[in-house]
């Protein structure tokens, strides 16, 4: 018993250090339940104060499920994703436009099935990321696979009423991976029941 106490203390301090790290950017994702022009639903990505919509994620499903990320200011598609993720099959690829390099870069998302929950492995431009989520938690953390560097997290906000919109707080801790990667992952996890709606 006494041997496990120091281990628990170190583990608790480590978790608190991770949780206390300050984000460099924050967003609020708001799920829109209405359908428009062939899309199942949209998710608006707003600034942290919810005063300005920065991006829209538009999702459609058919034989191939699709998500497009639209820059709200320019109305340009800045990233797209396609594959199958709604049913048991999971196979997803995506492309993100890099304005500095003036080119599209591809990536993949794979599901890692667990007994009580699923995690995801993301590959993008030689970056390998994983998610960490417990079955009882509405918080998802993303980190580098190799060195466990903490990159981002998102969590669902508590709703007082069922008719109020589903909202997620997104916190970004690094510029090493485009924010679109996190937006895509959030959208897929939302489709697969993260908000349980």
Where are these regions (language model features)?
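Classical eukaryotic N-terminal signal peptides for Sec-dependent ER targeting/secretion
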Residues: 1-9
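Intrinsically disordered, low-complexity proline/glycine-rich segments
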Residues: 14-197
């Amino acid at each position: 018993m006494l041997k496990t106490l120091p281990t628990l203390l170190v583990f608790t301090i480590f978790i608190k250090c991770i949780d206390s790290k300050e984000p460099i950017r924050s967003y609020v994702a708001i799920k829109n339940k209405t359908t428009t022009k062939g899309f199942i639903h949209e998710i608006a990505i707003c600034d942290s104060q919810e005063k300005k919509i920065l991006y829209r994620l538009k999702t459609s499903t058919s034989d191939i499920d699709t998500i497009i990320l639209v820059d709200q200011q320019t109305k340009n598609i800045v990233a797209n994703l396609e594959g199958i993720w709604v049913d048991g099959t999971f196979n997803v690829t995506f492309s993100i436009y890099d304005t500095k390099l003036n080119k599209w870069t591809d990536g993949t998302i794979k599901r890692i099935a667990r007994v009580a929950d699923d995690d995801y492995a993301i590959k993008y431009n030689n970056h390998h990321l994983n998610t960490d989520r417990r079955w009882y938690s509405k918080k998802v953390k993303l980190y580098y696979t190799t060195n466990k560097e903490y990159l981002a997290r998102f969590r669902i906000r508590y709703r007082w009423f069922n008719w109020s919109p589903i909202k997620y707080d997104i916190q970004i801790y690094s510029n090493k991976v485009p924010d679109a990667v996190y937006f895509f992952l959030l959208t897929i996890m939302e489709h697969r029941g993260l908000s349980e709606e």
